[in-house]
């Protein structure tokens, strides 16, 4: 679960000029050497430790992977490829749990924002301060700000994508991350799914990986400096856990087996 080696093998089979380099982004000297040697035109930085829960158990590793390694990439760019473009896949978790403290309206199957100002979600100027992010959110936010800073300070073409729930047909999911794919897999295998708080009415903003790839392509074609984008599927593609249960069951014919943990998930 969560292993991406099969995806790599598929890429190697289907894309003739795909080249995989087994390189730990935490290794500063090797990252510097790679940039000096290869001099990439564009960098799409997707590497991450993606789990809230795991971050709390291994905070040093989480920060090294998410934050320090991003600095390795940025400084390598500055030294060897300052004209390159970098797209960093950040996360909406940079806003922490602050959105949960906005006034909410409870409906039968979901919560929605009561204030019409947030009818279509929150903007990029929403505060990232004085909120609980989870350690994962904090490490990703550190990298997010550093990408912006290298862009603004060194005039590096760059953006941070603060994505919703990215999903697609090749999503490698586990309980700790990969919401929609994991929920569907759990239903098909007739296993028990755990809901963490909020009565199962918490809403997830889902966006297909093809849409994310399309955005990245357009940004690289017309790059800007130090930009930030909230990238989601929009209200029409959002779904609460309760709603997802109903939708998946209508497709598979399997009733959702679940356990409700009343403790709200952090971040």
Predicted regions and their residues:
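Hydrophobic alpha-helix immediately C-terminal to the catalytic Tyr-X-X-X-Lys motif of short-chain
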Residues: 142, 146, 150, 183, ...
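A conserved pocket-lining segment of Rossmann-fold NAD(P)-dependent short-chain dehydrogenase/reductase
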Residues: 55-56, 120-134, 158-172, 182-207, ...
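N-terminal Rossmann-like NAD(P)+-binding domain of SDR-like oxidoreductases, especially those catalyzing
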Residues: 1-164
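Residue-level signal for the nucleotide or nucleotide-sugar donor/cofactor binding architecture
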Residues: 26, 57, 65-68, 134, ...
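A structural alpha-helix within SAM-dependent methyltransferase catalytic domains
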Residues: 35-36, 74-78, 148, 184, ...
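A glycine/serine/threonine-rich, flexible loop-to-helix segment
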Residues: 101-103, 173-181
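C-terminal substrate-binding subdomain of Rossmann-fold SDR/epimerase-dehydratase oxidoreductases
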Residues: 23, 187-267
């Amino acid at each position: 679960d969560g292993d991406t080696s099969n995806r790599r093998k598929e890429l190697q089979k289907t894309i003739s000029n795909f080249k995989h380099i087994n390189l730990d982004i935490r290794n500063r000297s090797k990252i510097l050497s790679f940039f000096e040697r290869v001099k990439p035109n564009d960098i799409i930085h997707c590497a991450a430790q993606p789990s809230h829960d795991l971050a709390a158990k291994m905070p040093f590793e989480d920060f090294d992977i998410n934050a320090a390694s991003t600095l390795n990439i940025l400084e390598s760019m500055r030294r060897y490829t300052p004209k390159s473009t970098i797209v960093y896949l950040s996360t909406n978790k940079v806003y922490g749990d602050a959105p949960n403290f906005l006034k909410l309206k409870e409906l039968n199957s979901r919560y929605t924002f009561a204030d019409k100002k947030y009818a279509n979600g929150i903007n990029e100027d929403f505060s990232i301060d004085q909120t609980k992010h989870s350690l994962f959110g904090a490490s990703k936010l550190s990298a997010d700000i550093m990408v912006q800073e290298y862009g603004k300070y060194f005039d590096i073409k760059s953006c941070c994508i603060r994505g919703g729930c990215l999903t697609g047909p090749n999503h490698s999911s586990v309980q700790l991350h990969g919401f929609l794919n994991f929920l569907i897999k759990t239903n098909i295998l007739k296993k028990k799914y755990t809901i963490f708080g909020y009565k199962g009415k918490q809403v997830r903003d889902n966006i297909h990986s093809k849409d994310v790839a399309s955005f990245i392509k357009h940004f690289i074609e017309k790059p800007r400096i130090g930009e930030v984008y909230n990238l989601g599927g929009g209200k029409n593609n959002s779904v609460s856990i309760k709603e997802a249960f109903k939708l998946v069951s209508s497709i598979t014919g399997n009733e959702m087996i679940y356990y409700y943990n009343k403790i709200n998930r952090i971040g």
